[in-house]
């Protein structure tokens, strides 16, 4: 295959849509149309973006080509399938916040889920690292505390880019007045926000953040790990915070069973990090890199298992200096 040129730097790019109308229209369709029709509309929207959004198409091909070169189990490059899967996930994300996935539709793997639930029942908080692989909205199942064995309401603080998530939050508030999302802007981490994070942990809550993207305002600081056989930059701040709060840390993934069908069936994976955290400034860089390496190892495992549920549509291997394979 012809070599794909390095993509534009995406750090600092603004949200593509500045309107809440697409979210509200999707909600209206979910409320009034049968599922088969919503499926059809979703596929049409995915095809439209696949044809007219060159960057989305090329970055999907770049990722799948790298995966094919790295993995012995992935052999077919299907960028349209990945874009369609992403479109379905967006629809299900809106559906999840207005109509939570029934507990019986979520399959918990035999991993560290029980350890996390037991820890929360003991009033001990945790630091959760997610990614843009799969659908992290499955975490909302924790709200169904009686069904999974959690005996109390768990406070959850989400670290996210408010410039990107603000329109989604506004739309959800209009569609569901019970919608509440305690967010902390990753682009404005101060001593006050760190104190807020610590308070959430000390109250037995969860602090959730994505470990696979750089902060747009702190993109010059990053950790380097090999991902699918090539060096890639990973968030510095997420792993710094994990070591700073020194709380038990878990990697969480939620995946749809079936790539391009609105079926609301999910599988949830919870993996407790083994890296030793805390201990002050001495050795912090080593601990951060150890945690990041552990996360990337799991990310590589799951990306081969669910290859079309990868939702980073940019040059993932580009460093802030505009080069790939930076040292």
Each PLM stretch: what is its role?
Residues 120-188, 217-223:
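Catalytic core of membrane glycerolipid acyltransferases/transacylases, capturing the structured
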Residues 102-108, 182-188, 227-229, 281:
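Short, flexible loop segments at the rims of nucleotide/cofactor-binding pockets, characterized by
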Residues 111, 159-161, 184-186, 271-273, ...:
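Conserved beta-strand termini and adjacent loop/short-helix elements that scaffold enzyme active sites
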Residues 21, 56, 108, 189, ...:
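Soluble or luminal CAZymes and related metallo-dependent hydrolases
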């Amino acid at each position: 295959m012809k070599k794909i040129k390095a993509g534009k730097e995406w750090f600092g790019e603004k949200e593509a849509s500045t309107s809440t109308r697409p979210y509200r229209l999707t909600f209206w369709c979910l409320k009034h149309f049968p599922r088969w029709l919503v499926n059809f509309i979703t596929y049409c929207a995915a095809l439209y973006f696949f044809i007219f959004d060159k960057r989305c198409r090329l970055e999907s091909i770049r990722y799948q080509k790298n995966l094919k070169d790295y993995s012995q189990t992935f052999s077919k490059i299907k960028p349209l399938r990945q874009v369609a899967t992403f479109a379905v996930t967006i629809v299900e994300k809106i559906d999840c916040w207005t109509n939570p996935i029934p507990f019986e539709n979520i399959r918990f793997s035999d991993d560290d889920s029980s350890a996390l639930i037991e820890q929360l029942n003991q009033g001990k908080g945790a630091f959760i690292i997610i990614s843009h692989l799969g659908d992290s909205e499955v975490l909302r199942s924790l709200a169904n505390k009686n069904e999974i064995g959690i005996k109390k309401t768990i406070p959850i603080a989400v670290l996210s880019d408010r410039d990107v998530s603000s329109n989604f939050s506004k739309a959800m508030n209009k569609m569901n007045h019970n919608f509440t999302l305690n967010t902390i802007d990753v682009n404005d981490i101060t001593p006050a926000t760190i104190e807020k994070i610590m308070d959430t942990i000390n109250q037995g809550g969860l602090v959730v953040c994505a470990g696979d993207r750089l902060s747009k305002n702190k993109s010059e600081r990053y950790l380097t790990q090999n991902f699918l056989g090539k060096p890639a930059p990973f968030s510095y701040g997420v792993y710094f915070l994990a070591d700073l709060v020194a709380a038990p840390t878990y990697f969480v993934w939620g995946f749809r069973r079936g790539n391009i069908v609105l079926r609301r069936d999910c599988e949830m994976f919870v993996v407790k990090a083994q890296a030793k955290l805390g201990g002050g400034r001495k050795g912090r860089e080593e601990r951060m890199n150890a945690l990041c390496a552990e996360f990337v190892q799991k990310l590589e495992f799951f990306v081969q298992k669910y290859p079309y549920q990868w939702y980073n549509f940019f040059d993932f291997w580009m460093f802030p200096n505009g080069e790939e394979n930076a040292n």
